[in-house]
């Protein structure tokens, strides 16, 4: 279970980006975080694994308080949080298998990593996961030879190779075409259920969020102002979350669906 309590993030002397935010996520739940640009969605995800340092508050994952960990302790604890990025964050010149095995770097020796002598169990699990997401036949292909959707599937498998206790996805479909975006969202939803893995997604496309999520969290100016099932996200709720956003921009992210 992830439990966030009174989480605040402030840059310098400006207004807080996150304002005493409280959120609990558990089980095989896919939670989509929506809101206009600047609402604090990406900052929230990055504060969870301390890619961004919280100013105050608590982030607890299955009994471990992340905000008080030392740098050394944090390096180890981050293995428990999988992360999927909008820009894929793959090494183009490496193969799919080599990129996937990057998810195990915190678990194997430096020598094994440098010589790419991966443990047999890791190779077996990598093939199982790649088969599950439909990229096993690309195992020996360079990452820069893949399409955007294929690259994002590599990113998902890399994160799952950590055997994480929670998966965070920061705008995982933002650079993909509509059909591929739906495939990735469907994949993340199915994996959450199959692996009993909580998944939190920062997403702009509200139509996809409503279709594939178990829960939607709406943010505005660093606060959570909506937290409920997709069916409860009415037009009035959308007007509150996206107040001030031009109608044409809402349409682009599916905010009127």
UniProtKB/Swiss-Prot annotation:
Where is it mostly found?
membrane
Q: Give GO cellular component annotations, separated by semicolons.
A: plasma membrane
Top-level taxon? Bacteria
- Which GO MF terms does the UniProt record name? ABC-type phosphonate transporter activity; ATP binding; ATP hydrolysis activity
Under SUPFAM superfamilies, the record lists: P-loop containing nucleoside triphosphate hydrolases
Q: Does the keyword Cell membrane apply?
A: yes
Functional summary from the UniProt entry = Part of the ABC transporter complex PhnCDE involved in phosphonates import. Responsible for energy coupling to the transport system.
Q: How does it assemble?
A: The complex is composed of two ATP-binding proteins (PhnC), two transmembrane proteins (PhnE) and a solute-binding protein (PhnD).
Belongs to which family?
A: Belongs to the ABC transporter superfamily. Phosphonates importer (TC 3.A.1.9.1) family.
Output this protein's name. Phosphonates import ATP-binding protein PhnC 1
Q: Which organism is it from?
A: Ruegeria sp. (strain TM1040) (Silicibacter sp.)
């Amino acid at each position: 279970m992830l439990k966030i309590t009174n989480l605040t993030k402030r840059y310098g002397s400006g207004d807080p980006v996150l304002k005493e935010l409280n959120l609990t996520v558990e089980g095989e739940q896919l939670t989509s975080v929506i809101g206009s640009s600047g609402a604090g969605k990406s900052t929230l995800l990055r504060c969870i694994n301390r890619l961004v340092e919280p100013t105050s508050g608590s982030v607890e994952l299955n009994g471990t308080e992340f905000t008080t960990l030392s740098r050394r302790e944090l390096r180890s604890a981050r293995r428990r949080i999988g992360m999927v990025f909008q820009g894929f964050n793959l090494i183009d010149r490496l193969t799919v298998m080599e990129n996937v095995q990057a998810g195990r770097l915190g678990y194997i020796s430096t020598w094994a990593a440098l010589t790419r002598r991966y443990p047999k169990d890791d190779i077996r699990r990598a093939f199982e996961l790649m088969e599950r997401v439909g990229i096993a036949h690309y195992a020996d292909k360079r990452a820069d030879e893949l399409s955007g959707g294929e690259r994002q599937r590599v990113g998902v498998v890399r994160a799952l190779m950590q055997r994480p206790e929670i998966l965070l996805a920061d705008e995982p479909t933002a650079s993909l075409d509509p059909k591929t975006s739906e495939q990735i969202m469907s994949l993340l939803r199915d994996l959450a259920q199959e692996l009993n893995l909580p998944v939190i997604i920062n997403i702009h496309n509200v139509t996809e969020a409503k279709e594939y999520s178990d829960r939607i969290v709406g943010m505005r100016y660093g606060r959570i102002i909506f937290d409920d099932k997709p069916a409860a996200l009415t037009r009035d709720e959308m007007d509150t979350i996206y107040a001030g956003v031009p109608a044409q921009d809402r349409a682009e992210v599916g905010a009127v669906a």
